[in-house]
Amino acid sequence: MTKQINSQQIAIDGPAGSGKSTVAKLVAQRLGFDYLSTGKIFRAFYYLIKENNWSIDQLISNFNKYECAFNGDQVVINKENISQLLNDPTISKGASEIAQDPKIRAYALSLQQDYANKKPVVMDGRDITSVVLPNAILKVFLTASAQQRAIRRIKQLNLELNKATLEQFTNEIQQRDDNDTNRKLAPLMIVKDAIVIDSDQLSIEQVVDKIISLYKQRLGVNYA
């Protein structure tokens, strides 16, 4: 049975630190699509769990009582923008932990797919290409060497780039890659119909241009 391709969905996956969120946001802006950072959904989940001292089951039971808006990488809950709060390392770590739970992953999946079915969208995150948007017209796996991703992360944090710092960050990224690849639920993987883009020698703008070009090719028409 031939699957129905959705021409208004672009899915971008890749390892931690590959720049997929930055790229996805810019691609969406260029195309006039919505952008959704799916990782922010899990961070919002954990934020509510932490604030209310809830279990995962309690979160799922109560989440629809909140007025939540996910707009790109901005998250607003009951008219309060909590986006900056979600960047806290504790929230990030907790989000990664609860994302291993099948129940919360299934709940997030329903929210993500409902969002994607309402409007043209570019999404980035784990299992976007394999589970969340399996019929997306374009699936991209964005990658880069662990060392290059470490350098980018060090610069992003405004830290001094030296041998010790580079070694530390590279080791941490390699460990994260191993964990993500070998975990049982939603492991890091390249689906067979994804286009792999290695950004080691490419600027962000070049990666965005390449994805836009690939999208136009898939669409088969000129896209202004």
From Swiss-Prot:
The keyword Cytoplasm applies. It catalyses: CMP + ATP = CDP + ADP; dCMP + ATP = dCDP + ADP. CDD domains: CMPK. InterPro entries: Cytidylate_kin (IPR003136), Cytidylate_kinase_dom (IPR011994), P-loop_NTPase (IPR027417). Its EC number is 2.7.4.25. GO terms for molecular function: ATP binding; CMP kinase activity; dCMP kinase activity. Keywords: ATP-binding, Cytoplasm, Kinase, Nucleotide-binding, Transferase. The keyword Nucleotide-binding applies. ATP binds at G14, P15, A16, G17, S18, G19, K20, S21, T22. This is Cytidylate kinase. The gene is cmk.
